[in-house]
């Protein structure tokens, strides 16, 4: 028991998950032999140190990160929006923690309707000349995917490089023959973290929920819509599906391209950084004036960048914090920050859906909502449909 306890205790310094550590310690105390065997099987992050061992960002992009860090330190980086100046410290944190380059020459289109989003996506894919990179957590073999698949096959026949990256668990309703059909048409396909023993996974949190499409390095789509008929409101269970997706034109698309390739390299055991044409840093004309940082987090991340951004925004809010989310299950730090904000006079409002897509998670959400109501927050239920968007807003003054 003492040896096992030391092994688990040492994980506290590595994982920064004290709740999990105490759970294992109690299990080891009451059933030491069984507990130790279970810990060896499911308690360790065997994959974490191996995941995404891709090369660091190279060349011009890596230099851009370093250059921006220096200019921010010396207060030389010009923020095109006066409001953005208030987030200078957060911009710097994202640069250092996530190598998230700030770009300010982007044009962003916002889609909150699935039909409009998929129509825009297909039209942009039809204009592709060099490559199309597609990454989704969920893809269902229905009319929505078939419309996309048709365009991908046509572009592959024209000589456009097409890659499709899917998550094994999220796309479990797809069959091997569906992916083989794409391969026969000249499309590269890779599966993220294939399931073992059917659908059994020792760590279900090692999933890739990203929804990214990059076209020629010039146009990028990112957001909450997966691929399926429910996302265009054709599922009777959910009705109209409320989500948000972005179409970005401008220099920020390069960051999306890099994110896709990091995931692709891990899943396909390749190194696309060697293919220079995928990572040309275009000298963009000014498409717009929207500043963008692409921030990502996951089991491979050394820092919880997205989590820390939320925490910073909540702590610095002076007027209000508004949150829309399908799953309100915050960790202790976020929950405490929201309670403190609410009790300090900040107007905290949380909106959740009226229809669950994951019942257990839904009722867990209500448990935390109860705590927030007790702390003085206002909580709302979106009655029209399932709201899948995860979107916080805050105001300083």
For each predicted feature, which ranges?
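Transmembrane helix-loop junctions at the membrane interface of multipass transporters and ion channels
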Residues: 10-11, 15-19, 43
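Charged, low-complexity intrinsically disordered terminal segments
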Residues: 57, 73-397
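Membrane-embedded alpha-helical segments of integral membrane proteins
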Residues: 5, 10, 21, 27-30
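Short, surface-exposed helix-loop/turn micro-motifs enriched in polar/charged residues
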Residues: 4, 17-19, 348
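Single conserved hydrophobic/aromatic residue that forms the stacking wall/gate
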Residues: 1-9, 14, 387-397
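Transmembrane alpha-helices and immediately adjacent membrane-cytoplasm interface residues
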Residues: 24-55, 59-71
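Alpha-helical architecture
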Residues: 9, 30-33, 157, 343
């Amino acid at each position: 028991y003492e040896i096992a306890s030391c092994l688990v205790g040492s994980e506290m310094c590595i994982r920064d998950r004290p709740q999990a550590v105490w759970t294992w310690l109690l299990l080891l105390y009451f059933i030491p032999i069984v507990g130790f065997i279970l810990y060896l099987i499911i308690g360790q992050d065997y994959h974490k140190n191996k995941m995404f061992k891709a090369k660091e960002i190279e060349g011009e992009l890596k230099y851009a990160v370093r250059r921006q860090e220096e200019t921010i330190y010396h207060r030389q980086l010009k923020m095109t929006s006066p409001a953005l100046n208030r987030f200078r410290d957060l911009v710097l944190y994202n640069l250092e923690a996530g190598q998230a380059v700030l770009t300010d020459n982007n044009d962003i289109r916002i889609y909150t309707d699935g039909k409009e989003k998929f129509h825009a996506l297909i039209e942009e894919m039809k204009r592709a000349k060099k490559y199309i990179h597609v990454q989704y957590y969920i893809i269902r073999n229905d009319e929505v995917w078939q419309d996309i698949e048709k365009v991908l096959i046509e572009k592959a026949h024209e000589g456009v490089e097409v890659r499709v990256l899917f998550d094994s668990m999220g796309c479990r309703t797809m069959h091997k023959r569906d992916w083989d059909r794409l391969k026969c048409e000249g499309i590269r396909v890779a599966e993220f973290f294939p399931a073992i023993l059917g659908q059994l996974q020792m760590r279900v949190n090692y999933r890739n929920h990203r929804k990214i499409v990059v076209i020629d390095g010039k146009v990028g789509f990112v957001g909450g819509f997966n691929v399926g008929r429910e996302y265009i409101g054709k599922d009777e269970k959910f009705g109209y599906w409320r989500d948000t997706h972005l179409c970005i034109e401008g220099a920020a698309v390069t960051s999306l391209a890099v994110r896709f390739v990091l995931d692709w390299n891990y899943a396909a055991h390749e190194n696309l950084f060697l293919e220079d044409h995928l990572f040309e840093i275009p000298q963009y004309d000014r498409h717009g004036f929207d500043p963008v940082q692409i921030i990502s987090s996951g089991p491979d991340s050394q820092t919880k960048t997205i989590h820390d951004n939320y925490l910073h925004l909540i702590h610095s809010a002076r007027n209000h914090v508004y949150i829309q989310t399908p799953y309100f299950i915050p960790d202790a730090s976020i929950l405490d920050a929201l309670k403190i904000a609410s009790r300090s006079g900040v107007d905290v409002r949380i909106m959740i859906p009226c229809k669950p897509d994951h019942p257990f998670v839904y009722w867990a959400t209500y448990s935390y909502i109860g705590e927030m109501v007790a702390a003085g927050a206002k909580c709302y239920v979106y009655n029209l449909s399932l709201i899948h968007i995860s979107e916080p807003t805050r105001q300083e003054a």
